[in-house]
Regions:
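Conserved acetyl-CoA-binding loop-helix of GNAT-fold acetyltransferases
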Residues: 56, 64-79
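Glycine-rich, often proline-containing surface loops adjacent to acidic residues and nearby aromatics
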Residues: 50-56
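Terminal substrate-recognition subdomain of acyl/acetyltransferases
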Residues: 1-5, 9-50, 78-318
């Protein structure tokens, strides 16, 4: 009996004249991923690589939660490895579906700013490279996504589900560690110590939040001379991406803290509304939790910096 099936569509591999017409606004049927990358995201070279988009994947209801969907995707990858540049998917995103696709090696390339008429959800586009050309496509669109998502979260994506945002960010390839000036580290450490205010300068808090949620590695996160920053910045878990409140590692945020970063820092919701949504006792305890989360991120990204050490010593924290 057939218990798991997938429908694929071959996309890309378009001639230069078709790519140019797509870039200029013409729709090319049957090329959803290259169309979005080319017309919306302004990447005329995106329709050069050949990919297979998973249009639909389904497992019989009596055989679900046994890994059959993942096994089928692994077979598809093996079949097209060497014959295509990437596998891709576009779907109405939920935390559970994000968990599934991320676990199968697909990485975020785009999140729509409007909701899909059919699903009522934002649409996620994800890629799994099979060749150097596919890897280059996935790398640049992942990088461009990281570069633009911060601005979108305070605008078109301001009301997106925080677990969806956590998921699409965690499914990005990590970027470089964030770099803050000495002045910015002083402000962030001040909030972690309880004496400073987040509203003084939200910028460095947003960069640290995006770095943490995309899995950027820790490291030397500052400038010794306090100058300008050197860089910018079907099967799944029922409760959202990585939903374990374990805090065994000292520099790991809990899911609740991650939601707090999304809602308050990245989406800019009022503290009282965030406190109510995330079940904090009061606005004050919500902001205290925000300070605690940033103390964790200071440990991860700036714990070895002289400016951080000096500031912490002033407030009695080694």
């Amino acid at each position: 009996h057939v218990v798991s099936v997938a429908l694929l569509a071959r996309e890309g591999g378009l001639a230069a004249d078709r790519r140019a017409s797509m870039y200029e606004g013409e729709r090319v049927r049957g090329n959803m991923l290259p169309d979005v990358f080319t017309s919306q995201l302004r990447d005329e070279a995106a329709a050069v690589p050949v990919g297979y988009r998973v249009v639909r994947i389904a497992t019989h209801h009596a055989a679900r939660s046994r890994g059959l969907g993942s096994a089928l995707l692994a077979e598809i990858r093996g079949e097209f490895d060497g014959d295509a540049d990437y596998l891709g998917v576009g779907y109405g995103v939920t935390p559970q579906l994000l968990e599934f696709w991320t676990a199968n090696g697909y990485r975020t390339a785009h999140l729509s700013t409007t909701r899909n008429d059919a699903s009522g959800e934002h649409s996620a586009l994800m890629l799994a490279p099979l060749s150097p050309a596919g890897a280059a496509l996935a790398e640049r669109h992942g990088r461009w996504f990281r570069d633009r998502i911060g601005d979108q979260l305070t605008d078109q994506l301001r009301d997106a589900d925080p677990d969806v945002i956590r998921g699409v960010l965690s499914a990005c390839e990590p970027g470089a560690p964030p770099h803050l000036t000495d002045r910015e580290w002083q402000i962030v450490v001040g909030v972690g110590s309880g004496s400073g205010q987040y509203a003084t300068a939200p910028g460095p808090f947003r960069r640290l939040a995006l770095a943490a949620l995309t899995g950027a590695p820790g490291g030397d996160g500052g400038d010794a001379d306090g100058g300008e920053p050197r860089g910018g910045s079907e099967e799944g878990a029922a409760d959202g991406p990585g939903d374990s409140d374990s805090d065994d590692a000292p520099d790991v945020l809990t899911p609740r803290e991650e939601r707090l970063l999304v809602r308050k820092v990245l989406q800019g919701h009022p503290a009282d509304a965030v406190a109510a949504e995330l079940d904090y006792d009061s606005e004050r305890t919500c902001l205290q939790a925000l300070g605690s989360a940033y103390a964790t991120l200071v440990d991860r990204y700036g714990g070895d910096l002289d400016v951080v050490t000096r500031e912490r010593e002033r407030f009695g924290r080694e």
